Amino acid sequence: MNNTEYYDRLGVSKDASQDDIKKAYRKMSKKYHPDINKEAGAEQKYKDVQEAYETLSDSQKRAAYDQYGAAGAQGGFGGGAGGFGGFDGGGFGGFEDIFSSFFGGGGSRNPNAPRQGDDLQYRVNLSFEEAVFGVEKEVSYNREATCGTCLGSGAKPGTAPVTCRKCHGSGVMTIDTQTPLGMMRRQVTCDICHGSGKEIKEPCQTCHGTGHEKQAHKVSVKIPAGVETGQQIRLQGQGEAGFNGGPYGDLFVILNVLPSKQFERNGSTIYYSLDISFTQAALGDTVEIPTVHGDVEMAIPAGTQTGKTFRLKGKGAPKLRGGGQGDQHVTVNIVTPTKLNDAQREALQAFAEASGDKMLHPKKKGFFDKVKDALEDI
């Protein structure tokens, strides 16, 4: 067996996270569950998935598997030349106990203990203004819920699961294997109860013995003012159903703020770019500035330069931590005209002369130049 076969069984890459492995296991386990999939070979595939997950879900077993393959994960290393001689493997009192301790016995976990359900993620888009002022959104999604027919037991109403006759409720079987190092002991998932410790003689017809069913779910999310892209809101108990009576997992709402056509934002500060003419910059003016709180008047002092930034106090977004309101920064951009009529050109030339600017005056426009300008203006 190569060192990627277990990953292939679950359909994940070798660098998959534990969360990815867990999700893939649940998907494949449900796909090949003998109570659901009656196709030939489905039961064997189900066992293969269980075997792969048993190793990859344990960080120490996974590390051994990545380095040595299945033999490493199961404790079956072969002895090298002049290797671990002197171990006769008598009984089970020595070497195999070291490996059992190193790899962590799977039987120590109680398969019947309540376990919390999986967490879910949901992405919500917000307009620029919704992120600034806050909003309440209703989100709809599908989740694994406790089966309404069997109430999560997996058994047909009127019946109940019984203790597994093979593993006696432990969910695992102990297998002893003779190796060059001596007798090695390993634990595998029980092939009768598939690790649950229980047998369901008469499965529920709604959930086919899983105890869960897919359900459309809605929940209202209160999004506070001042949030930003990437922030999360945790809704406790709105994830997927638990196991053996365990609680539901949580829902994490991930926020994405859509861009504004006129504003930019960083934290509680909002940024706005203002175009003004060079006469407004030179002589000064009072202009109306849009903000998320409404238009306000702002004075442009005479002699304002391109790149000058003005601050409108309290016109930004709320501060999530510490309270208070941010500011809006207005950056000025002086627009140079690209076309001048004769009167404008002469006025500017007179201004240049009065300022003492030394310029090479452009030649006076002739008849054809004026015709060309007139055509461009049509």
Curated annotation (Swiss-Prot):
Location within or outside the cell: Cytoplasm
Transmembrane feature ranges: none
Free-text comment on the cofactor: Binds 2 Zn(2+) ions per monomer.
Domain of life: Bacteria
Binding site for Zn(2+) 1: 147, 150, 204, 207
Free-text comment on this protein's domains from its UniProt entry: The J domain is necessary and sufficient to stimulate DnaK ATPase activity. Zinc center 1 plays an important role in the autonomous, DnaK-independent chaperone activity of DnaJ. Zinc center 2 is essential for interaction with DnaK and for DnaJ activity.
Protein name: Chaperone protein DnaJ
Gene that specifies this protein: dnaJ
